[in-house]
Amino acid sequence: MKKILFLIVLGSVLSCKQKITDADISNLNGYWEIEKVELPDGDKKEYKVNETIDFFKIDGNKGFRKKVMPQLDGTYVTNDIQEDIVIAVKDGDATIQYKTTYASWKEEIIELTKDKLVVKNEQDLEYHYKRPVKFSVK
């Protein structure tokens, strides 16, 4: 009985992670804003308003990420700083490998749909992103 319970618990834990395919990677393109961050100790930090959001542009398995600032008229302000990225997909696991002049790091993609992105970095911080809703003042 204990073995069956263990297998059920283990199966449910392992099934929480989405198997990422090359076809899923195109969902990464576009604008993403942080919704929350889950810390290794289980605490969560919620983000109600974001001053900057991330813009991803992927072609094949290479591309870049830029930080952009949404404006009240629905446009975005950006600068020339970008992080070059390479996407590595193997056996259903996918990582985003970032590189700048000053550093390189990677994040594991936990979930990726057209409206949701969850990544985990090397410090076990889990970032939950959603598509931003454009706002404007008229």
Identify the function of each model-found stretch.
Residues 106-109, 115-128:
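Short, exposed beta-strand-loop hairpins at the edges of beta-sheets
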Residues 127-138:
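Short, low-complexity, Pro/Ser/Thr/Gly-rich segments in the mature regions of secreted, periplasmic
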Residues 45-89:
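N-terminal glycine/threonine-rich, aromatic-flanked beta-hairpin/loop signature
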Residues 1-4, 18:
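Positively charged n-region of N-terminal signal peptides that target proteins for export
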Residues 12-15:
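C-terminal motif of bacterial Sec signal peptides marking the signal peptidase cleavage site
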Residues 34, 63-67, 94-98, 117-121:
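Short hydrophobic/aromatic-rich beta-strand segments that constitute the beta-sheet cores
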